[in-house]
Amino acid sequence: GFGDDRIFIERYVEKSRHIEIQILGDEYGNVIHLGERECSIQRRHQKIIEESPSPRIDPFLREEMGQAAVKLAKKIKYCSAGTVEFLFDDQTDEFWFLEVNTRLQVEHPVTEEVTGIDLVAEQIKIARGDELEFVQDDIDWHGHAIEARLYAEDPGNNFLPEVGTLHAYDTSLASEVRWDSGVDEGSIIGTDFDPMLSKVISWAPNRVDAANKLARGLEKAHMGGVVTNRQFLISCLRNESFLNGNTTTDFIEREVLETKKNLSANELHQASTAIALWLAQKNRDSDPVTGFMAANWTNGRMPLQRVKLLFIQDEVEVKYKFNKDNLYEVMGSICEIHHCDSAGIDIEIDSHRFYAHVTKAGSEIIINMPFGDVNASVLPRFIEPGNDVPEGGLIAPMPGKVIDVKVKKGSKVKAGDTLVIIEAMKMEHSIKATEAGKVAKVMIQLLSLIHISEPTRQWSI
């Protein structure tokens, strides 16, 4: 291409890091650097965790790379805030120029946190013709800052973007970290824009404390309605290799990282108990008769109350009953509700008291437990006539993507034959023939997206 038949051969760098240098240059020829950021943890070649300073770069390398960036900027008479990006060889300490981003980067807050310099303000001052108010020797670095990018995407499905409505989004529960958000509760996440919901930044005197602080902040926030990479980020930040600074660009490929929150048996018990009693109290308060009765009222003859909950793969039937002294007995635990309203429940389970914020959207529940958000679905006690899709029905039981079409127009099938396979909620669902017949018309295509109850086949007997 370009009328040039020369071939460029680049050296293969087995263990590499993405290191970038923040610079400021004014129209008077003054250029300084504000140290490095490491942005090596990436998926699909896009950054998800950035930090400053890098755990790999020592003061000598910082000065060497910083001066290389300053020299380049002075050569082109650069005038603005900018980022000079380098490829760094983790084994040899060599580095190579990649590009200059002539703007503030998404990750610029980590530099602000460790230098105390407002980069947005400095960029505006430079643009209006002001001279830099400091020289290189004035720049110092304090502590460690880490930023995580919170995306509406599914790490368990190749980080594909997700859509939906944010039924819950409350970051006030995690005020110890900085949230730069572009969404609120009720925001509709679509496909027209980048799926980043927020960037979350922590600062601490040292790197391990900054990582732990950021992980806990992500964990404490209350959000749901759209699949995010939150648990994946938490898993990265708590990973031993990450904490040891082994963060080369192959980090995600070589480490075993959680894509979904895995609940212990005790955590599952606590979450299901809190949800069941919150639902019981909510239903009781809305009842015109029981809403006026004492909370511990019972006629002594009522059977155990039951509610079925689905937690990702775990289906739990919670059995509970009212006991004396305003206590509840739930699956062997003694529980007391200290306060309960539509926003959440203050509950004590086996002498362990905590408050859990609760959001309900249809049959979906998001409960903010001491160990983080837990998502569950309330399963119906009885299948409502007319609303269920019989097994083998020819309509889609849920929204999803067609990943396999087993038949075509004119195909003869027997009852029970698989016609279409749909992928939804990261599981495969087969639509089967309810009786023998011949396919009259194929109404969907491979890889097409279909909506719930959308027809997939017409056929004749």
Regions of interest found by a model, annotated:
Residues 2, 6, 51-89:
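A long amphipathic alpha-helix within ATP-dependent nucleotide-binding catalytic cores
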Residues 69, 109-329, 334, 448:
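Catalytic cores of soluble metabolic enzymes centered on carboxylation/carboxyl-transfer
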